[in-house]
Curated annotation (Swiss-Prot):
Locations listed in the record: Cell inner membrane
Subunit structure: Homodimer. Forms complexes with HypB and SlyD, and interacts with HycE, the large subunit of hydrogenase 3.
Main function: Involved in the maturation of [NiFe] hydrogenases. Required for nickel insertion into the metal center of the hydrogenase. Mediates transfer of nickel, but not zinc, from the low-affinity metal-binding site in the GTPase domain of HypB to HypA. HypA is involved in maturation of hydrogenase 3. It may partially substitute for the function of HybF and vice versa. May act as a scaffold for assembly of the nickel insertion proteins with the hydrogenase precursor protein after delivery of the iron center.
Top-rank lineage group of the source organism: Bacteria
Positions bound to Zn(2+): 73, 76, 90, 93
Binding site for Ni(2+): 2
Protein name: Hydrogenase maturation factor HypA
NCBIfam families reported in the protein's UniProt record: hypA (TIGR00100), PRK03681.1 (NF002979), PRK12380.1 (NF009046)
Alphabetized UniProt keyword annotations: Cell inner membrane, Cell membrane, Membrane, Metal-binding, Nickel, Zinc
C-alpha cells in the first residue's frame, strides 16, 4: 500500500505551505490522482485521514479528482482518452503506438486554510 507514503509526503508539503501562510488549520485539500498512479481512491482517503490526525490538517475536507487516461497516438496523430487503463490501444485507429500524457503521480491542486 503506497497510499500511506503518498499521504505522508503530501502532508509534509501541506504543513509547509500552511506554516508559510500563517494558517491555524487546513480546512480543505484538493488532490489530483494521475490516471496511471495505481492509487485506490478509497485507500488514499483512509490513509489521508489517518496521517492528518494530530496535525494542522486534522479533520480537513479531502477533494479527489481522478485524471483521465490520456495518450498521444503516433498513428492517427491525435490525443485520445483510453477506454480503460489496461487496454493500451487507440480507441480511434486501434493502433498501439501510444505515448502516455496522463500523469502517474499525485498533485496537490489547492489548499484551503483558516488563519484565525
Amino acid at each position: 500500500m503506497h497510499e500511506i507514503t503518498l499521504c505522508q509526503r503530501a502532508l509534509e508539503l501541506i504543513e509547509q505551505q500552511a506554516a508559510k501562510h500563517g494558517a491555524k488549520r487546513v480546512t480543505g485539500v484538493w488532490l489530483k490522482i494521475g490516471a496511471f498512479s495505481c492509487v485506490e481512491t478509497s485507500s488514499l482517503a483512509f490513509c489521508f485521514d489517518l496521517v492528518c490526525r494530530g496535525s494542522v490538517a486534522e479533520g480537513c475536507k479531502l477533494h479527489l479528482e481522478e485524471q483521465e487516461a490520456e495518450c498521444w497516438c503516433e498513428t492517427c496523430q491525435q490525443y485520445v482518452t483510453l477506454l480503460t487503463q489496461r487496454v493500451r490501444r487507440c480507441p480511434q485507429c486501434h493502433g498501439d503506438m501510444l505515448q502516455i500524457v496522463a500523469d502517474d503521480g499525485l498533485q496537490i491542486r489547492r489548499i484551503e486554510i483558516d488563519q484565525e
